[in-house]
Structure formats: C-alpha cells, structure tokens
Amino acid sequence: MTASIVAHLKLARDDFTLDVNLHLPGRGISALFGHSGSGKTSCLRCLAGLERAASAYIEVNGEVWEDSTRGYFQAPHLRPVGYVFQEASLFPHLSVRGNLTFGWRRVAPAERKVSLDQACQLLGIGHLLDRRPATLSGGEAQRVGIARALLSSPRLLLMDEPLAALDSPRKREILPFLERLHDELDIPLIYVSHAQDEVARLADHLVLLEQGRAIASGPIGETLARLDLSLAQGDDAGVVFEGRVVGHDPHYGLLDLRLPGSSGPLLRITHAAQVMGSTLRVKVQARDVSLALAADSASSILNRLPVRVRESCPAANPAHVLVSLDAGGNALLARITRFSADQLGLHTGQILFAQIKSVALLG
C-alpha cells in the first residue's frame, strides 16, 4: 500500500469553519500554505488531537488515529506526533541536554527512530548541550526544539510556522537544517507557513488553504504553475524544479542540471562544482522568462528551451499576460506583455522558445 496521510476534518466555530479533505504523501514535506486565518494551524491541531473536530477521519500511513463515525479518538499523548511551534518553549530549568532527553528517555529503546547523537548532528547543536535555554539565540533555541521533537520518535512531524518569530539571518541559519531533515530522515513532515520562499525551498507537496477550505493540493512544481490560483499572480510567481547534476564546466563555473522526465530539458546555472548525480532545487520566476518564435543563438541568455503553450490568462497587471508552458513534461510560467502575446500570435499548443534570464538556486 502506498504510504499516505488522509485527513477529513470539519470544525465549526462562531466565526470560522474548517472543512478540508487532505490526501498527502506519506513521506517528504507537505506544506500548508495560506494567509493568516485560512485554517493552517487548525489543521495541525486536529492532526495532533489538540482540537477535536465535529467530524474527522485521520489515517497516517495505514494507522487510524481518529474516526468520528465510529466514535474513535486517539488521545493526543498517544499519537506519535512531534510538534514544533513558533516558539521553542524549552524547559527553562533544564539544560539543552535535559530538554532533549526529557521525552527521549520515555521512548522504548526499540521504538527510537533517532539517537541523541544523530539529532545533535542533524541540527548542529552538539556544542550547546550544557547551555541553558536563556543563553540561546532564537535560532539555536528553535533548533533545539526541533531536535526535541525528533527525539520523541514521531511517525509524523508537525511544524507550525517554526521560522515566523525569527529575523532573516536566523531563518537563513535554520533552513539548511530543515533541508537535512528532509534528505536524511524518513519521517513525513507537515509544514505550515505563509512565506512562499520557505515553501518553495522545502516542500515536495503543496496545499493552498483559503477560508478553511483546501482549494488546491498537488506536487509543488505543478501547483505553483496553476494559472487559476492566486500564487501565479504575485510578483514572485514562478515554478520550482529539482534537477540532477549531469555536468560541470570549471572554466566558466557552470553546472548542467537535467530536469525530471524522459525528455527533461537541460538548465545551465552558475555554481561551484557539485557531486555528479546529486540533486539541486532551483526556482524560475515568471518575470524572468521571455518567449520567442525561434531560438536566438546570438543571445547572451544561457537557457533557451523549446516549450509548448498550455494556456494563458490575464495577469493582475492588465498590461501583462501569464502563460503556462510545458518544457519537456515540466511546468514553466512566463509573464509577458499583452503586446508581445499578440506579436507572437500566442495560442494553446503553440511551440515557442522560452528564454530564461535567471535561475535561482534554492539552498
């Protein structure tokens, strides 16, 4: 059976109703994304059992945690969940080591998924073990909080805007550690955020919430490229790719990335040498993609890809058009002027060349 997380939740309050049907991958990072008040935290609290929905069915990789039709509700302390809040909320009277081992000692040795040494290595906190929480920076405290959640040996890790209370330098400090959790641990993670840059960098699967409803859910690359969603209308609209390193030009400092799919195109980016076959995540902004009827070999633009027009729609700025493109099975977005669209004779199914002016490496 395919690993998956299923949650059907209905929760009514005086001023808010949550009504979602979630089907998420049972591994990797799934992001719940939306504005404040859209229902992101309510979803997490229901999954953890901290909020009891009027109607609920929750199943995590084959194990039922809640089924209101049968009157079954697994108590919060019995759910194998690690919960990371905006604030680390460490025990102030214990050292970092004491905070980490508090829950870990209560897990049977045979059930432990992560060792103390492994958690310290993953989060880079080995040098903090003898410190008290009051002496930690915000970023250090949050890393300790994440390690503490891991050491409870959860089957599901929930993170509720773990970077929201941190300034930009501390956010940049923690993001690489979250990427390591994704790469090195086989624990599914549901990540709540309203920051699109965090989601683009971390998530494999994206759920867009609006007013208590899940209006979109799918792989992050495809979901970011949907023209019917508000995500495509923002100034930072774009798509995310995970490319495999297939070449390196040390003279010019260029990497060749092969995008997914049997006919996945090649992207060239400026970057130091990487291990051949390794995977890198990149983002291409819609504003950095122009379209042409033919490949221009005289251009200084490195990346010129043959593409097929999927669809187009008006952009938020009435002078522009958003264009959804297929690049060898990969979704790509372009934002061009209406004048340019008319000059190209833009239509569905048309074969064009996408000229990508900039590719941003995430991480």
From Swiss-Prot:
One of its GO terms (cellular component) is plasma membrane. Residues 1-236 form the ABC transporter domain. Signal peptide: none annotated. It catalyses: molybdate(out) + ATP + H2O = molybdate(in) + ADP + phosphate + H(+). ATP binds at residues 34-41. It is a peripheral membrane protein. Its EC number is 7.3.2.5. Residues 298-363 form the Mop domain. Keywords: ATP-binding, Cell inner membrane, Cell membrane, Membrane, Molybdenum, Nucleotide-binding, Translocase, Transport. The keyword Translocase applies. It is found in: Cell inner membrane. It holds the Pfam family TOBE. The complex is composed of two ATP-binding proteins (ModC), two transmembrane proteins (ModB) and a solute-binding protein (ModA). Belongs to the ABC transporter superfamily. Molybdate importer (TC 3.A.1.8) family. Part of the ABC transporter complex ModABC involved in molybdenum import. Responsible for energy coupling to the transport system. This is Molybdenum import ATP-binding protein ModC.
